[in-house]
């Protein structure tokens, strides 16, 4: 641990507040809150942690904290700091999941619509519905029962809906505000849980029509009753008080938290939301952060009541969200919380089971690959690929897969130093020589299998260096691509012989992942270098710009395009003196062809 960290830990206050963990670049990588800052922040640097938390702690080189006057203030501040800094280790709920609502527009001649965007436009919104089908079925029923306007624009003549008795034709007839209000009130009553009353009224009208021998009308009313029954059958009542509430439950296992939310609307359980994320705080703290972000999401509306598990501070939730929050001790609400907790626990168990199965399949693929190639199981695979464009900025990349999974800390990038022009074979010789000379010198682990992204020439060049120069005899295979630049097969041996793998086998998928990953890593590195060289060459002729300032500009702007779009003030912000900023601006503005 850094000495300055020890000094800062020693003077932490025993008050509530927020803390910001920073990496060596000074970037905020995690924001947390605590009832007692001293205890919480120190806990990161003492005791044992799971691997995920160890990764976080391993990146921390500094921290700062903000003392607050209460836990509520700390919770509010934490959410604002997360939004401001977007730390990579914090959960960030996305606004990508929306639910459909039925809307009665506030137009002079109102309409019924399905929408996923709730606006402050004086319209009346009902929902959310669990899915689009449920919303459309309900709207279809309401369209049959209540003759509101259907057309988005007023036509010049009556449409089919008028002839079907489903519209009053405000396009050609006068429909008063009172008539519309009466219809809208009926729709609101239905959507607010009054469907039983509406059904009873329709039933009475049906019998009256039958007695008057109006059989067509009676049949129409009977069909409407049947539609109501069909829709309501799908939305069984679980609470008799018709209160809109969200019921929360959660579970924690192996450093992960799952939160399940049951949406209860008008007494019916209509939908649930499942969120799963890594957790670095105490479960209760993680849950409070989650619920704060949950209701900041534009698709989640605060109901009349929020129901939380017994371990959560419901008073804090209530003050923070300004909604009634309860912790039921018995009854149906307690049953729902326990059901949400149970579902969260099951979801986590499924997650870890699937991870375990995936690991089993991956290990099996590694073992089978060894058998197919006639070698020992290649638990460690290293793969190489070259990248250049017409010989410029030639680079190579090496990636490592351990137990069938990418080991990104083992990846290495190489600028080609000894080869002039686009010579793939000599580039492969150089990079293999550099990699394994260093491995021997530093006692680094050697791979069980080396994969060269290329054909016989690449394989021969790499094998020659490995065996004849370094005296290493490590199994080596070439990955051959087809005409579409996709993984085709392996070649191995001397002379190289093709090894055909079944395309739907796990070992083939493993090779595809290796090839795609090494290609991605190499080409990304090449593009970075190419971008830097373009910027640096573009800046070569500007007076007052040396290597140091080139690096500063490259780091600040990232691309020549952004530099050409920048103002003089932005160059000053990047650390350039005013006169140099003016020179750069003038030069780049004049050089339109750059």
UniProtKB/Swiss-Prot annotation:
Transmembrane segments: none annotated. PROSITE patterns: GIY_YIG, UVR, UVRC. It is found in: Cytoplasm. Pfam families: GIY-YIG (PF01541), UVR (PF02151), UvrC_RNaseH (PF22920), UvrC_RNaseH_dom (PF08459). GO terms for biological process: nucleotide-excision repair; SOS response. Residues 196-231 form the UVR domain. Residues 14-91 form the GIY-YIG domain. Keywords: Cytoplasm, DNA damage, DNA excision, DNA repair, Excision nuclease, SOS response. InterPro entries: GIY-YIG_endonuc (IPR000305), GIY-YIG_endonuc_sf (IPR035901), GIY-YIG_UvrC_Cho (IPR047296), RuvA_2-like (IPR010994), UVR_dom (IPR001943), UVR_dom_sf (IPR036876), UvrABC_protein_C (IPR050066), UvrC (IPR004791). GO terms for molecular function: DNA binding; excinuclease ABC activity. CDD domains: GIY-YIG_UvrC_Cho. GO terms for cellular component: cytoplasm; excinuclease repair complex. Belongs to the UvrC family. Interacts with UvrB in an incision complex. PANTHER family: UVRABC SYSTEM PROTEIN C, UVRC/OXIDOREDUCTASE. The UvrABC repair system catalyzes the recognition and processing of DNA lesions. UvrC both incises the 5' and 3' sides of the lesion. The N-terminal half is responsible for the 3' incision and the C-terminal half is responsible for the 5' incision. HAMAP family: UvrC. This is UvrABC system protein C.
């Amino acid at each position: 641990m850094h000495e300055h960290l020890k000094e800062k830990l020693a003077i932490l206050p025993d008050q509530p507040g927020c803390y910001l963990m920073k990496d060596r670049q000074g970037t905020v990588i995690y924001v947390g809150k605590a009832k007692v800052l001293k205890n919480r922040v120190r806990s990161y640097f003492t005791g044992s942690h799971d691997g995920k938390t160890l990764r976080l702690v391993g990146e921390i080189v500094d921290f700062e904290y903000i003392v607050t006057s209460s836990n509520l203030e700390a919770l509010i501040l934490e959410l604002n700091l997360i939004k401001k800094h977007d730390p990579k280790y914090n959960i960030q709920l996305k606004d990508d999941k929306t639910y459909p609502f039925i809307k009665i527009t506030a137009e002079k001649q109102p309409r019924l619509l399905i929408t996923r965007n709730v606006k402050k436009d004086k319209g009346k919104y009902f929902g959310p519905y669990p899915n689009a089908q449920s919303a459309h079925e309900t709207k279809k029923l309401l369209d049959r029962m209540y003759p509101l306007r259907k057309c988005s624009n007023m036509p010049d003549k009556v449409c089919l809906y008028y002839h079907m008795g489903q519209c009053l034709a405000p396009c050609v007839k006068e429909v008063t505000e009172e008539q519309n209000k009466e219809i809208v009130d009926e729709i609101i009553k239905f959507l607010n849980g009054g469907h039983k009353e509406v059904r009873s009224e329709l039933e009475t009208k049906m019998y009256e029509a039958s007695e008057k021998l109006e059989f067509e009308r009676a049949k129409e009313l009977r069909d409407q009753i049947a539609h109501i029954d069909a829709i309501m059958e799908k939305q069984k009542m679980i609470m008799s008080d018709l209160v809109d509430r969200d019921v929360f439950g959660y579970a924690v296992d192996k450093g992960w938290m799952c939160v399940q939310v049951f949406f209860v609307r008008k007494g019916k359980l209509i939908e649930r939301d499942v969120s799963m994320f890594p957790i670095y705080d105490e479960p209760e703290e993680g849950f409070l952060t989650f619920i704060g972000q949950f209701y900041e999401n534009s698709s989640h509306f605060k109901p009349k009541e929020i129901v939380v598990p017994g371990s959560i501070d419901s008073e804090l939730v209530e003050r923070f969200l300004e909604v009634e929050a309860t912790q039921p001790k018995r009854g149906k609400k307690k049953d729902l919380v326990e059901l949400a907790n149970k579902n969260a626990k099951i979801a986590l168990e499924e997650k870890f089971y699937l991870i375990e199965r995936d690991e089993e399949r991956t290990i099996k693929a590694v073992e089978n690959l060894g058998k197919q190639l006639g070698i020992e199981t290649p638990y460690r695979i290293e793969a190489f690929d070259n990248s250049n464009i017409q010989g410029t900025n030639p680079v190579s990349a090496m990636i490592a897969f351990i137990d069938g999974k990418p080991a990104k800390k083992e990846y290495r990038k190489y600028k080609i130093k000894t080869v002039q022009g686009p010579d793939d074979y000599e580039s492969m010789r150089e990079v293999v020589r550099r990699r394994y000379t260093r491995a021997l010198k530093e006692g680094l682990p050697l791979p069980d299998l080396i994969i060269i992204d290329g054909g016989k020439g690449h394989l021969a060049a790499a094998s020659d260096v490995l065996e004849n120069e370094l005296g290493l005899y490590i199994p080596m295979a070439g990955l051959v691509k087809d005409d579409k630049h996709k993984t085709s097969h392996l070649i191995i041996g001397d002379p190289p012989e093709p090894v055909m793998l079944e395309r739907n086998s796990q070992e083939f998928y493993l090779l595809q992942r290796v090839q795609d990953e090494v290609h991605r890593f190499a080409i990304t590195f090449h593009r970075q270098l190419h971008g830097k060289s373009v910027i640096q060459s573009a800046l070569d002729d500007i007076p007052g710009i040396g290597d140091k300032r080139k690096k500063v500009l490259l780091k600040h702007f990232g691309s020549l395009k952004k530099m050409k779009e920048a103002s003089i003030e932005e160059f000053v912000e990047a650390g350039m003196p005013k006169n140099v900023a003016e020179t750069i601006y003038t030069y780049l503005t004049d050089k339109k062809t750059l």
